[in-house]
């Protein structure tokens, strides 16, 4: 039984006699008939004549690397061309003469991929074709390159979606934002949304939030965003914003900012006189003048006629059905009607607007422009297409109001801007026996006739003549006079002490 167990395959009694030296000798004896594949172990090994004669009839038991090594070492210069290697193999081993061309491809692959063989260029003084191949005794080891981990298919999908989200992000530079062409449906610049009106009875009541501005398809204000550079527009809007805020000396930046925060449209204080609730009637002789509004022209007035009282009991800020005065020829600054149709004219308009004196303009009427500029300031002037359209629309409203922009042809002036509180009076001054138009005072203290003549005439014993100046040009809204590049001097108004000191030397027929 024990002998059976000792002779079984599971017996390991041979393990103590196993040594490395004996294993190497046994492997050499087993592989003596055929050389192992791969690089040759001895770079200087040569094929003996006995081995060559023993394997002339059949396929030699050598690898292609060993055949190349034997061929190169047989040459006196230890180098051979590819054609010489082919010839040597065919001469020593006739088997490869009729073996086809596949073995030649294997020889070329071994020369190119095996590090033991090195290609040497042919010298200039050696005529012939092809480079030489030599045996490299010290081949360079390849540096182990880190293998790139192949991403999971789910990771590739997530990476593609992330790149798409980055490309669609609004935080890209302004020059990469795709803009609609001129022929597409864009955002025109003409805003006709009405501004909220206020009543004198409750001036602190906040109006409801106004709707988003609507745009109509007006070719005059259709802006082309295809060639625009938004950084330049941002600088222009920023300079306009600071010029509007920096030149409000009389009101102060704090009051203007508070008015924009609360979105209250204050009644104009430097515009023309709101004299629709106070007609110039004369008081009885010797009566002291009553408390006057700081922006109304002082006059000695009496009780109005009964049929005229109902006209002046309405609040002074309700809109009147009046036609504004068209701008007079020759007094415009030359700003074209298509000022915002391209980028060059828009920049030129900013130069004209920035050179004006904004200290005499009541910016509370342009709360939409100031709010748009303030929002752009908070966003560090990174403007998108819709914001540029809103700013251009607000700027066109400002230019139209100040008289810099001529009215659009084919459209009535009253429809090109929101309805604003009236700035001209519909009442009449009294002059004995002569119809007299009511006089209003603009932002520079100049007196001017209203755009529409009064429908009622009255007579009185005496009147107060107001010195008339040349009327400034009106825009299509008829609310603000157009100013030149420098503000005119404020005329000094004379305030008489009594009606006896008035000298009526004014030609009233000249303004009829």
Swiss-Prot record:
| Name used for this protein in its record | Forkhead box protein J2
Question: Primary place of residence?
Answer: nucleus
Function, please? Answer: Transcriptional activator.
UniProt biased composition (Basic and acidic residues): 48-58
A GO term (biological process) for this protein?
positive regulation of DNA-templated transcription
**A GO cellular component annotation in the UniProt record:** nucleus
Query: Is Transcription regulation found in the keyword set?
Result: yes
Ranked from the top, the taxonomy reads:
Eukaryota, Metazoa, Chordata, Craniata, Vertebrata
Point to the regions of Polar residues compositional bias: 170-204, 456-479
The gene for this chain is: foxj2
Q: Which residues form the signal peptide?
A: none
């Amino acid at each position: 039984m024990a002998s059976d167990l000792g002779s079984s395959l599971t017996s390991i009694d041979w393990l103590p006699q196993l040594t490395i030296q004996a294993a190497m000798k046994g492997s050499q004896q087993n592989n003596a008939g055929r050389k192992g594949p791969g690089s040759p172990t001895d770079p200087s090994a040569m094929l003996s004549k006995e081995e060559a004669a023993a394997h002339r009839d059949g396929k030699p038991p050598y690898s292609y690397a060993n055949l190349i090594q034997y061929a190169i070492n047989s040459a006196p210069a230890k180098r051979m061309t590819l054609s010489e290697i082919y010839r040597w193999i065919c001469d020593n081993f006739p088997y490869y003469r009729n073996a086809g061309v596949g073995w030649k491809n294997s020889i070329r692959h071994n020369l190119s991929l095996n590090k033991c063989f090195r290609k040497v260029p042919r010298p200039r003084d050696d005529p012939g074709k092809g480079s030489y191949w030599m045996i490299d005794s010290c081949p360079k080891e390849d540096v182990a390159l880190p293998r790139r981990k192949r991403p999971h298919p789910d990771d590739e999908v997530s990476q593609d979606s992330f790149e798409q989200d980055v490309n669609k992000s609004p935080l890209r530079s302004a020059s990469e934002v795709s803009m609609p062409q001129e022929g597409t449906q864009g955002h025109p610049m003409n805003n006709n949304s009405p501004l909220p009106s206020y009543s004198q009875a409750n001036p602190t009541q906040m109006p409801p939030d106004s709707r988003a501005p609507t745009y109509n398809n007006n070719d005059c204000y259709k802006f082309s965003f295809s060639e625009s550079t938004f950084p330049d527009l941002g600088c222009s809007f920023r300079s306009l914003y600071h010029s509007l805020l920096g030149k409000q000396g009389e009101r102060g930046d704090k009051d203007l900012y508070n008015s924009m925060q609360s979105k209250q449209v204050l009644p104009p204080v430097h515009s023309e006189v709101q004299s629709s609730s106070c007609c110039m009637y004369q008081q009885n002789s010797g009566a002291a003048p009553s408390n006057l509004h700081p922006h109304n022209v002082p006059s000695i007035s009496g009780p109005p006629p009964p049929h005229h009282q109902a006209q002046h009991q309405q609040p002074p800020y309700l809109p009147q059905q009046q036609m504004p005065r068209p701008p007079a020829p020759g007094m415009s600054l030359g700003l074209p009607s298509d000022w915002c149709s391209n980028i060059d004219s828009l920049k030129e308009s900013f130069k004209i607007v920035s050179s004006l004196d904004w200290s005499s303009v009541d910016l509370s009427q342009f709360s939409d422009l100031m709010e748009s500029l303030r929002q752009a300031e908070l966003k560090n002037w990174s403007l998108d297409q819709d914001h540029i359209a809103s700013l251009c629309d607000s700027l066109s409203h400002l230019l139209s109001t100040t008289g810099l922009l001529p009215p659009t042809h084919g459209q009535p002036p009253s429809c090109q801007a929101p309805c604003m509180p009236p700035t001209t009076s519909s009442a009449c001054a009294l002059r004995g026996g002569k119809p007299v138009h009511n006089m209003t005072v603009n932002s520079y203290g100049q007196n001017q006739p209203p755009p529409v003549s009064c429908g009622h005439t009255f007579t009185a014993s005496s009147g107060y003549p107001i010195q008339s100046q040349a009327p400034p040009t009106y825009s299509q809204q008829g609310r603000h006079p157009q100013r030149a590049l420098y503000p005119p001097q404020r005329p000094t108004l004379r305030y008489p002490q009594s009606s006896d000191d008035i000298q009526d030397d004014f030609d009233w027929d000249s303004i009829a």
